[in-house]
Amino acid sequence: QYYLFDEQDYVQELLDTFPEQLDENFSHNVTGLIEGIREHNSHSILHQLLQEYDLSTDEGITLMCLAESLIRVPDVATANDLLIDKLSERGWQHHVNKSESFWVNAASWGLALSGKLLAPNKSHPSEAVSGLLNKLTLNITREAVGRAIRIMGEQFIYAQTIEEAIENAKHLEHKQQCCSFDMLGEEALTEADAQHYFEAYDHALDVVAQGNQRKQQLLDNISIKLSALHPRYEPSQQHTVLPQLVKRLLALAMKAKQLNVPITIDAEEQYRLDISLQVIESVLSHQHLANWGHFGIVIQSYGKRALSILHWLHALADKLQITIPVRLVKGAYWDSEIKWAQQLGLPEYPVFTQKHSTDLNYLACARFLLTEGQHRLIPKFATHNAFTVQYIIEMHSTVEFEFQRLQGMGESLYDQINEQHGIPCRIYSPIGLHNELLPYLVRRLIENGANSSFVFQVQDPQIPLHMLIEHPADYLISSSILNPNIPLPCEILVDYPNSQGIELQHNTFYYQTMDKVLPFHEEHYRCAPIINGQTFLIDQPSDAISPVDGQSLGQNHWAQNRAIEHCQQTLADDTFEFKDLELITQAIDRIADGLQQHRHELIFLCMQEAGKTLQNAVNEVREAEDFCRYYSRQAQKHFANATILDSVTGEENILRYRPRGTVLCISPWNFPLAIFIGQVCAALACGNRVIAKPARQTGIIAMRAVEIIFEAGISQQQLIFMPGNGADITHPLIKSGLIHMVCFTGSTRAAREIQQWLFDYNQTFIPLLAETGGQNVMFADSTALIEQLVPDVIESAFDSCGQRCSAL
C-alpha cells in the first residue's frame, strides 16, 4: 500500500503523531554526546580527511573512485592511467592548508602537486622533463593512494577471515559489545557464487558457535544477504527462486538454531522487499524453527513501507507465537533507489527524498518497537545519530534493546552511551579481503559521508549545535517536506514530462498491468494501406502470426500496385499544405497522450507481434511517447524564430528552417513502435508530408500507431501509411522523383540499395538519413567492478536476443 505512496501525505501523517516538544534536559544530553564525538573524532586522521574531502565534492568522489578501483588493478601501467585520469582534472589546490591536521594538509599538497604534474601541459616545450616528473609523481602517488586504501580498509573492515574476526572480538564483551558478522560485500552472479557463499555462511556458523561458547550473553551473530544465496534473486524469477532460496536459508537457519548462533536477514533494494518477506515467512513458519527467537530481520526506515512491515512482522510473530529480533536501520541504497525510480518513470519514489523524513520515520518505527510491538519484536537500533540515540533512551520504555553501529563509525558515541546507561552495542562487522569488500566500503562511506548525514555534520565544527539537536519534525514543519532538489520522476526533464513507466517488480502493479493487457487477446486486428483517408484492402490478405504462441492476431493487407499507384498520384497532385507550427506540435503532444492512454494495448501488441518481454514492451511505449514530446519541443525551438548568425560587419546571415516536402520513413521490426513513431513525428513536426512504411513483421503495431496519430489531429493528407514488402514500395516511390527525403533504420545492405536508387533516379540531391546495423564492442579494463560489469554486458548482448543496433 505504501510502496509509492505520496510523500507529502505520508510525512504529514507522521508529523501529526509527533506533537511533543523536547525539553531543555534532552537538548543538554544530546549536546554532551555531540561534544564528546567531536572531541574524539578531532584526533582521527580518517575523519579529518573525510571532513576536508566530503562526498558532495568532485574531489571527495574522486578519492572514493580511486579507493574502490585502484586496489583491483594488477599492473602498473593501468594504475598509472587511472591516476592520471582521476587526479589531473580536479581542484586539489583548494584544499591545501585548510585542515587542522598536518597529515590531511600533507595529503592535499601531494594531491595538488600530483594533479598539476599529471595534467597534460600543452604549452611546455620540453616533453622529456614533463615525462620524468610524471613517472616520479605517479610512483609516489600510487604508493600514497595505496596506503590510504589500507588505512580505510583497516578502519572499516573488521577482519579478513571469520577466524580472525572471532579473535578480534574477544575483548568486546567486557565493554558490553558484540558483533554481527557480514561475510560478503556484494551479491552472487552465478550459481557457483551462490554455492560458495552458502558454504562461507555454513562455515561461519561453526566458527561463531565456538566463539559464543565462552559468552554468557550478547552472542555474536551472522548477517545473511539473500542475494548471496541465489543469482536470480529478483521478483521476475520468483516462481523459480522462492523454493530454492527457502530451502537454502532454511538449512542455514536450522543449523544456526542447533548451534545457538543468531542470524539476521539483511535488507536490500526496495524492489526485492516483497520476495524477501515471502522467503522470511516461509522459513519462520517451518516447524523446526518453532520457539527459537533468534531469526532476525532488518528494516530500512528510508522506505515508506517500513512501519507497515513492522505491523506485518508483529502479526506474523503473534500468529506463530514467536519473537523476532528487528534491526532498524536508515537504509543503504538511497542513491540507487532514487535513480531507479527516475529511470522507470514511476509516479513516486519508494524512499523518502528528505533525510529528515527518514529520521522521522525511524523515530516512528522505534516508537512502535518500544510500545505496540514490544511483546513480539525485539528492538536492535542501528544508528550513528546522537539525537536518535537520546530520543530512544528517553522514551522510558521497560523493553530491553541494544544499539548497533558500523565498524569504523560511531565508536565515540556508543562509548559514552555504555558509560552513562550501560546499554549494549553490537558492531556490524564486514569480513573479507580488502579488494573484495571495497565496493561495500565505498557505498557505506558515500551513505554516511554525504554532507546531509549526521556522521558528516557532527565532524564539521562549522555546523552549529542547534542544527544537530533539532527534531526532524521541527525541521520538516519549518521547511519543505519534499526535497526541492529532487523532482518527482515524471518531472526530471526540463522541457517536457518524463514518460510514465510501470513498476513490474512489484506484484501488485504487475498483476494490475496483466489484467489490463490480457483482454486484448480477444481483439482481431487489421493492417492495410491508408492514403488520403482511403483504406486499401486486398482479396487474399495474409495472417499476422504471433511469434510467441503461433496464434493469429489479424490480417495484413500489403500494399500492391493499386495502392502504390494511388500513392504516387496523390503525391503528384501536390494538394498538401503546411499547417501552422503550433497546431502541428499540439497534435504531436496529443499523440504522446494517446500512446499513454492506449499503452496497455500497445504493450500487448509489442509482446505478441514483436515477441518482446513485458518490460521491453513497457520501455517501447515509453520511448515512443518521449520521442513525440522531444520532437515537438525541438520543432518549437527551431521553427518558431529565425536565428541570426555571426557575420562580418555590414553582412547579415539568417538561418531559417522549412519543411523539405515529402519524407519516406522506413522503420524496423526490432523497435516497431518507438522508431516508427520517432521517424514519423520528427518529420511531421517539421511540417512535412510523411509516407510511413513499417517492417512487414510488425504491421499491426504500426497500424494501431497510425490510428492514434489520426485521432490526435494529424490530417490523413499529411500522413500516408504504406505497409508491405520493402522493395515493392520503396523502389517505385523513389523512382517517381516525388520523394524529398528518406529516413531509414535497418540493414546496411538495404540502406546502400536506397542510396543507389536516390542517386540513379533523381537530378537533385535527396538526403538519406540512415541508421544501420553495426557491430559493437565494449572495452573493460581491470578498474571495472565485475559485479556491475557482467549484468550490463549480459543485458546488452542477450536482451531482445541481441536484436538491437546497440547490442554487444
Range-by-range predicted roles:
Residues 1-501:
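Positively charged, amphipathic and often flexible ligand-engagement surfaces
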Residues 641-715, 787:
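Conserved small-residue-rich beta-alpha loop and adjacent elements
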Residues 436-438, 444-565, 569, 578-594, ...:
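Terminal low-complexity tails and localization/encapsulation signals of metabolic enzymes
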Residues 380-383, 741-745:
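Periplasmic-binding protein-like
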Residues 372, 652-654, 720-743:
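A structured beta-alpha segment of the ubiquitous adenosine-cofactor-binding alpha/beta core
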Residues 253, 366, 680-681, 730:
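Generic hydrophobic/aromatic pocket-lining and core-packing "Φ" positions
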